[in-house]
């Protein structure tokens, strides 16, 4: 006999579950009030009895802390229950264990576990629970899952999916595949949101394997455009917080994000899944912090802009060289060279009668070779003075000790990071590979190697408080940057991106290069593209072919390339497309230009036609819904119902980096894509 066989029975059961959740929320609210009242009683007692003995104070302090902790737990439970009221669950499997064929357990799956103490059973299982993995991994028939007690084998007899909104069941589908196509198609056909959403209802088998991978110390996810890699990485974080509760918390995780807009765009996913948001930072901030924020430097955004607007072959060569493994090898050789050649010991007159010989000082420099060079001076000073104490019964003052340390430090010719970095390029015979800009501004590509040298000389100051590091847009970071990350963050890592979407092809990394940089790592691939229609994905594939990409069979309009007589008519044409968007059922439109300066110029030109257009720039900190004009660089990782790409002529899009930008722009579109250009310029070679 199937439990809740009909849709009517399922709807009745849903209301029973919601009623039980309501009752539990009311109970927890009463419990919260009781804890608050008790804490107030303790407070009043302490105020009115100031002469109580220390033993009683200690006892009361323990009671207060205990009540406070219990109260926080109850508040957290109430918060979680409130989150599942609207959508208690989304799936169900009926599982029969092999060892007990007399019992069939209906497993309802939702965002959170809900245990009913009256019935003494789970009414809802958390999607991250071991038993819930079968919902994503198995069809009807034989199935298995890993539990703390070992592998559990059995049979899935029934599989259902529900769409529940605001406590009402809109429909129910019997499902015989991993996630029913109807559900997935309905989700994919919906409009883009102003924030990334959780995808627990539509997680696919290959995505689930990535989410639940607990073995890889470094997990590298190569995911094609629209494969959901960022969302999957965030669901992976939520899973790890659940599976390793007590070992890791939200504050122990760090996300390296490409920009503030993207960080804002993804900020809702973890809270939707019942977890706190995690700290985020940027690669630039990390590298600058290593260097004590001493140097002014070109940002990554500024580097990309220069490559798009005024590239020179010398600039490209400098970036390419510093993104090579040969460069890292040469740096390592130079660090060894400094060890053997940059310390020149001299005699030091300690007192009127005692001189420390240069040879003895040099011996101590070698004695402490396990220490980073700049950490050695303190240890050497202490050891030398200890020897002086033993041999001459000499005791020195703190100022005298500091003076000796200063003398020893001066013997090392590498106390200035920037100078030794310049020395390095002279040493390898490539002085032209280092160039500062006006006002001594460093090029972006020099920031990581400078930090690498600094760490080699000063010690790595590992950030041990971070227990899991998530790096998004992995392709935009070079091997030397990953080497710095390896030294700073010895924790587990999830690294994700797409080699086809680099906005800096001259200094980018593939999954294989990242694996080589870390000398370890498991590469997992996401090849199915879900974001765009089949027609848009096929169009983008012509710009930048990727044989591994599998488009989903969701059909829509063919992308349009609209020619105009001149620039003025092109602007008018874009304004007409904006008006058409306003009259459509779509809610987000991205007008994606090659560069930010082009985006700013277009905003000015379109102002006479519309006042509801927002510019998303490098200075922006939040993603806004509606009509947005932005650059391809800033649009990376975002998605829109409709996309317009202006100025798609050969004058504007002709280089390798231009091609990458065009591909990124085209793959932002979910449902509709239009490209415009003026016929006064030749048509684009990539279209």
Residue ranges of each PLM-predicted region?
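A structural signal for short, well-ordered beta-strand segments and their strand-loop junctions
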Residues: 92-94, 220, 255, 674-677
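Extended, charged low-complexity regulatory segments
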Residues: 1-200, 204, 208-212
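Short, well-ordered alpha-helical scaffold segments within catalytic/effector domains
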Residues: 196-200, 204-208, 234, 238, ...
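Generic detector of solvent-exposed, compositionally biased contiguous segments
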Residues: 54-73, 211-217, 222-224, 228-231, ...
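P-loop NTPase Walker
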Residues: 1-33, 40, 184-303, 636, ...
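Conserved helicase motor core of SF1/SF2 NTP-dependent helicases
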Residues: 246-247, 251, 260-276, 281-286, ...
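Conserved phosphate/pyrophosphate-binding and hydrolysis machinery centered on Walker-type P-loop NTPases
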Residues: 189, 193, 321, 370, ...
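Alpha-helical nucleic-acid-binding subdomain
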Residues: 241-469, 476-484, 492
């Amino acid at each position: 006999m199937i439990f809740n066989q009909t849709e009517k029975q399922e709807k009745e059961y849903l209301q029973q579950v919601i009623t039980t959740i309501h009752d539990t929320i009311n109970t927890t609210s009463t419990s919260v009030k009781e804890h608050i009242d008790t804490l107030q009683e303790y407070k009043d007692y302490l105020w009115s009895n100031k002469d109580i003995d220390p033993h009683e104070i200690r006892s009361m302090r323990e009671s207060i802390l205990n009540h406070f902790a219990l109260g926080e737990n109850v508040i957290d439970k109430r918060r979680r229950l409130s989150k599942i009221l609207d959508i208690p669950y989304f799936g169900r499997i009926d599982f029969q264990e092999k060892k007990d064929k007399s019992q069939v357990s209906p497993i309802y799956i939702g965002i959170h576990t809900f245990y009913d103490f009256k019935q003494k059973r789970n009414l809802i299982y958390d999607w991250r629970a071991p038993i819930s993995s079968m919902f994503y991994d198995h069809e009807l028939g034989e199935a298995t899952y890993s539990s703390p007690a070992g592998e559990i084998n059995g049979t899935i007899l029934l599989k259902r999916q529900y769409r529940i909104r605001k406590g009402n069941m809109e429909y129910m589908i019997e499902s015989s595949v991993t996630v029913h196509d109807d559900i997935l198609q309905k989700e994919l056909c919906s409009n883009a949101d102003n924030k990334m959403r959780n995808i627990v209802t539509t997680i696919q088998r290959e995505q689930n394997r990535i989410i639940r991978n607990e073995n890889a110390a470094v997990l590298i996810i190569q995911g094609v455009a629209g494969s959901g890699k960022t969302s999957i990485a965030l669901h992976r974080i939520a899973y790890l917080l659940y599976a390793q509760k007590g070992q890791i918390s939200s504050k122990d995780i760090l996300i390296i994000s490409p920009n503030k807009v993207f960080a804002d765009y993804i900020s809702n996913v973890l809270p939707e899944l019942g977890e706190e948001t995690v700290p985020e930072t940027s690669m630039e901030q990390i590298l600058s912090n290593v260097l004590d924020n001493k140097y002014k430097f070109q940002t990554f955004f500024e580097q990309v802009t220069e490559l798009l607007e005024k590239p020179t072959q010398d600039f490209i060569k400098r970036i390419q060289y510093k993104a090579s493994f040969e460069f890292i090898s040469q740096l390592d050789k130079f660090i060894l060279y400094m060890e053997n050649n940059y310390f020149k010991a001299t005699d030091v007159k300690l007192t009127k009668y005692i001189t420390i010989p240069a040879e003895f000082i040099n011996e101590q420099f070698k004695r402490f070779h396990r220490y980073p060079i700049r950490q050695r001076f303190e240890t050497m000073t202490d050891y030398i003075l200890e020897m002086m104490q033993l041999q001459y019964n000499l005791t020195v003052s703190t100022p005298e000790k500091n003076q000796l340390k200063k003398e020893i430090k001066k013997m090392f010719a590498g106390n200035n990071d920037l100078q030794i970095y310049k020395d390095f390029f002279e040493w390898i015979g490539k002085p032209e590979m280092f160039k500062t800009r006006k006002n001594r501004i460093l090029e972006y590509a020099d920031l990581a190697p400078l930090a690498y040298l600094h760490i080699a000389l000063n010690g790595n100051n590992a950030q041990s408080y971070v227990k899991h590091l998530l790096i998004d847009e992995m392709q935009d970071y070079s091997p030397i940057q990953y080497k710095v990350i390896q030294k700073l963050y010895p924790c587990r890592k999830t690294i994700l991106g797409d080699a086809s979407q680099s906005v800096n092809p001259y200094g980018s990394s593939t999954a294989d290069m990242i694996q080589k940089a870390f000398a370890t790592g498991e590469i997992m691939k996401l090849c199915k593209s879900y974001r765009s229609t089949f027609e848009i994905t096929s169009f983008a594939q012509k710009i930048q072919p990727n044989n591994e990409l599998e488009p989903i069979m969701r059909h829509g309009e063919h992308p349009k390339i609209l020619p105009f007589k001149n620039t003025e008519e092109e602007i008018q044409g874009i304004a007409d497309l904006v008006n058409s968007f306003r009259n459509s059922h779509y809610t987000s439109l991205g007008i994606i230009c090659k560069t930010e300066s082009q985006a700013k110029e277009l905003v000015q030109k379109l102002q006479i036609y519309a006042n509801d257009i927002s510019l998303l720039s490098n200075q922006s900190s939040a993603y806004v819904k509606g009509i947005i004009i932005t650059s391809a660089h800033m649009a990376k990782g975002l998605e829109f119902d409709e996309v317009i790409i202006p100025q798609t002529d050969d004058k504007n899009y002709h280089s390798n980096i231009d091609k990458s930008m065009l591909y990124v722009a085209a793959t932002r579109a979910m449902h509709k894509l239009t490209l415009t250009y003026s016929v006064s310029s030749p048509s684009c070679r990539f279209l």
